[in-house]
Amino acid sequence: MIIKNIKSIPSPNLNYIHISFCPNNEYTNLAYVSISSILSSKSLNTFICFYLIIPSDFDKKNKNFLDSLYEEYEYFNITFITMDKRYNNSYTDHRITEQAYYRFSLGELLPNVNKCIYLDTDIIVYKDLYNFFNLNFNGRMILGYPSYGNQNRQKYGFHRINTGILLLNLFEMRRNHFEKQVMKIIKKGRKFQYHDQTLLNDYFKKYLGIFPPEYHARPWSNYTEMKIFNNIIGKPFDSDYFYFSHKYPTIRHFLGNYKPRNFNINYIEDWWFYARKSKYYNSKSTTFQSAFSF
């Protein structure tokens, strides 16, 4: 581990949280804003260990840009891990790159870490993640939030999870040789409709559990989806609880077409609040332009 400043040195008196992102060059600015929101929202006694799994062509200037977070925040460190070519033959398209599959290798890439939060780069965090990090897996290996797409509703019901925010039991992933299982599936050459998300839900359903809605709020919500979530977990519907979880979540995910380039979606100003906090932010510069092309 490279020590960037004295307050990036771990201490036994702090609560540790392990978080991974898998950005490429195009998504660096989104990752910067996501990490900034995490560091702005964490408690003083929380130390964040970030693991950025990057492709071999990740630009040095993008590493330096992310390292500039040390100038603004404290009690965290960032470890860059360059991925090899193991996912070169995974199914991709113009929108989804092979980095989408990197999360499946976190158990092997982080051999000394037993659990980890995985986050897509299109999220912001409002609160300390300690409670999320310490959720009970209840015998499951991967926790996520139900995927509510219309096609999922019609074909699968609601027992599928979105892979943009995951809590991973890396110890169990290693014990179950999860990465090897994934690689065998990828080698078969199947074209997954929703890429990593289809792969995980189609082949590993027995490993999957769900976490509360406060850890995966979206820019929109509706009564039907909330009620079906309660049907899944077998508890009475509580509209006040869901309203609070959506209005005041721990994590918000700008998934699908609801991205920072779209100023007409709910809560997008929250994202730009963290973007503007950076001393590198300039609305007329190219520093944050890639956020619009995502």
Where are the predicted features?
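A glycosyltransferase accessory/donor-loop signature
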Residues: M1-I17, F21-P23, V33, L170-F294
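Short aromatic/hydrophobic "clamp" motif used to bind/position activated sugar donors
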Residues: C116
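Conserved donor-nucleotide/metal-binding helix-loop-beta segment in metal-dependent transferases, i.e.
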Residues: I123-Y156
